[in-house]
Amino acid sequence: HNRGRLCMANRYRISDLDFVYISYMEPNKEENWADLKNKVPWAKRVDGVKGFDSAHKAAAETAETDFFISVDGDNIIDETFLLQTLDFEKTDRKAVHRWRAKNIINGLVYGNGGLVGWDKETCLGMHTHENAKDKKAEIDFCWTVKHENLHNCYSTSVINSEPFQAWIAGYREGVKMSLN
């Protein structure tokens, strides 16, 4: 399989890209990893890396393709995502590409927890969260790294497999919604 090499004038099949599963302490991470490997047998994994920036850099180092898809440890992908293409004539290849996810608790569909496409150089060159060089970058990628927000939903964010996981997710959402 020649993943990531098939380019039709800046169009890439999602199924030709590396997928990197990023897990840390999600209580459902092993179940979700098994689900991903069933759907995406070539998926790779980064587990237990402390810090958002560091974990994403580890994912970029693990990916063998120049552009890769990250899947959070609490995310379940929809197999139809593998049938999609990404057209870099319509988006900025160097930007972070974020697809929406369905929040399993409230049914809302939005960017948080969704699948993310990363240009390897962009990911390795960013300084966010624990490695941030300014206050805005400490909060989230979206404040300092260019984003392409894509409006299709290809996954479900399963953030309620244990009560504490649901509480953490809700707290994070509340804090982010209160920011300007």
Question: Where do the model's predicted regions map?
Answer:
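Catalytic-site signature of metal-activated, phosphate-bearing donor transferases
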Residues: 1-4, 85-180
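Flexible, glycine-rich phosphate/dinucleotide-binding loops
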Residues: 27-28, 77, 105, 124
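Acidic donor-diphosphate engagement hotspot in glycosyltransferases and nucleotidyltransferases
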Residues: 80-82
